[in-house]
Amino acid sequence: MANICVVGGGPAGAMAAYAAASCGNKVTLIERNEEPFKKLLLTGSGKCNYSNSDLKSDSYNFGQNHPFWKVLEELNSDWLEEFFKEKGMLTYKKDSLKYPRSERSDTVKKLLSSMLLEKKVDIVTRKKAVSIKKKSEGETNGEYNKEAGCFAVAFEDGEELNFDKIIIATGGKAYPSLGSDGAGYRLARELGHKVSFTYPVLTRLLTDDKDLNAVTGVRFKAKVTGEVDGKITESEEGELQFNDNALSGICIFNLSRFLSKPIEENAKCIIIVDFLPEMSEEELEEYLKKIPDGEIGRFFEITFGEKTAALLLKKIKDENRKNVKDISYIIKNFRIKITGHDSFNQAQVTKGGVDIDEVDENFESKICKGLFFAGEVLDVDGKCGGYNLHFAFASGYKAGMSAGKEI
């Protein structure tokens, strides 16, 4: 039986602790807050969109050739659904999004808490790990003592405890008010790991385009495309939301994964909005040709609504666009300069983190044997729609099982 410490009481940490304890180990879960799962309660607007039936390798930043994808092929959406059902939580699917049947995040919190209680996991709250050191022979009071454990964990209150294995599942930097301050990155660096620069993603994109003030509060189905220094990055379709000096909506959140870093590097970033993605430019041109003279304004208002119509017509006038080809181009290629993104205070996820090339398919460090990682502390980010939470659950389970069995 090994003595295993899991640092971080979120979904990844809970699954890691449960899995490791299921293998017959003594497991201690360390959580800096007064209780675990604070951030979990916010997911899916409080409904906990825990997974997505449309899991694909391109939904994440690592792609299909990375060993992590093989893990997700095994521990897929169906696996997680069955896992929860076996533990007593029914689920349901809306489109491809998966939720607990109760549509309440606290249902998942209660389930995870009961799972940890069942496996007698020792949950220690209000405890922050500030240092982890791998002990080698001669470093334990002058003599190596296997019974003392291979890792020394120092805490903010001055206490130091020894463990055989460590699983770091501290999350990233998103929602720092809930304890996500990047502490896990410091611990990883201390143990020899590279940590890439971090950026807030799945967040709003900011703009200083004053013309957009007229459409604040408007929502419109559209296709949005990111452009960085003249090169197209990615496209998404969905509901585009115009906020005060910002663009929002799931389609924008997904694009922020590709734009946050270039924004920080002062690249020229543009969002190109296609207000009629269901029609090609040629089809739209032909349609516009059939509209009688003097009726174009009516077409815009009926099709796009009063505020959006006014925005488009102003753009057409400002750029002196008069023929149907030019008008069609504006509708299909409305360009918005992006000047920034929201901070980690508003972002859902962190881009960047512990270098995943230094972690194997069992989520064990290639640098420090006995050290494992799970969840958002790793340089893994996925799309909106349950992808990131699924990775937290799956990576936590895999890390816990790997740590628990390798004794």
Predicted regions and their residues:
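Residue-level recognition of phosphate/Mg2+-coordinating polar/acidic sites
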Residues: S22-C23, E35, K56, E73, ...
